[in-house]
Curated annotation (Swiss-Prot):
Family the UniProt entry places it in: Belongs to the RuvC family.
A Pfam family per the record: RuvC
Protein known as: Crossover junction endodeoxyribonuclease RuvC
GO molecular function, one term: magnesium ion binding
NCBIfam families on file: ruvC (TIGR00228)
Stretch forming the signal peptide: none
Annotated source species: Chlorobium phaeobacteroides (strain DSM 266 / SMG 266 / 2430)
Annotated EC: 3.1.21.10
Gene: ruvC
Length: 187
């Protein structure tokens, strides 16, 4: 299964494509779509759409994992973020991909075992789980990869008809997480 994770933003949009097969997780591609602040918002949305479409065409994901909207005190920022999300949703529908949305707390819980984890903790666990180091220096990328991982972990949980210990919403302790991912333990 291949999933495209998207961390939307009006100036930087993170993306990460993760494959899960019998040998585990692997990153097919990841990065940040950097948008020039001098361009109109409509031009930036068009750029996001086109660049993500190229990524979809080259990596062939079956699903898109998108971060849900968070409440913002700045209405203008929230509207712009909503428009970026709309472009990603439209692209998902136009390319016949399943779209799944996850709240930041749900992603944090799936990847670290704690819904209140910091960005640093999420980045650490994402790079460990995907066995990538060094070249990922942006939280936009680790957040997008975390979204893809969250989706893949949720698929696995649904397929097994019972949540894996330490990953489900109900079990937020490290013991359950270590049982679910023994290969992550450094001895």
């Amino acid at each position: 299964m291949v999933v495209l994770g998207v961390d939307p933003g009006s100036l930087k949009t993170g993306y990460g494509v993760v494959r899960q097969d019998s040998s585990g997780f692997s990153v097919l591609t990841c990065g940040v779509i950097r948008l020039h602040s001098g361009k109109s918002h409509a031009e930036r949305i068009g750029q996001i759409y086109r660049e993500l479409e190229e990524i979809i065409n080259s990596t062939k994901p079956r699903r898109v994992a998108l971060e849900t909207v968070f409440l913002s005190k700045n209405a203008q920022s929230a509207l712009k973020l909503g428009q970026v999300r709309g472009a990603v949703i439209a692209l998902s529908m136009n390319t016949d991909l399943e779209l799944h949305e996850y709240a930041p707390r749900e992603v944090k819980s799936a990847v670290t075992g704690r819904g209140s984890a910091s960005k640093e903790q999420v980045a650490f666990m994402v790079t460990r789980m995907l066995q990538v180091t060094g070249h990922i220096t942006s939280y936009d990328v680790t957040d997008a990869l975390g979204l893809a991982l969250c989706d893949l972990l949720r698929i696995g949980n649904r397929a097994a008809q019972e949540p894996a210990q330490g990953i489900s919403r109900g079990n937020k302790n490290w013991t359950g997480f270590v049982r679910a991912f023994p290969e992550m333990v450094v001895r």
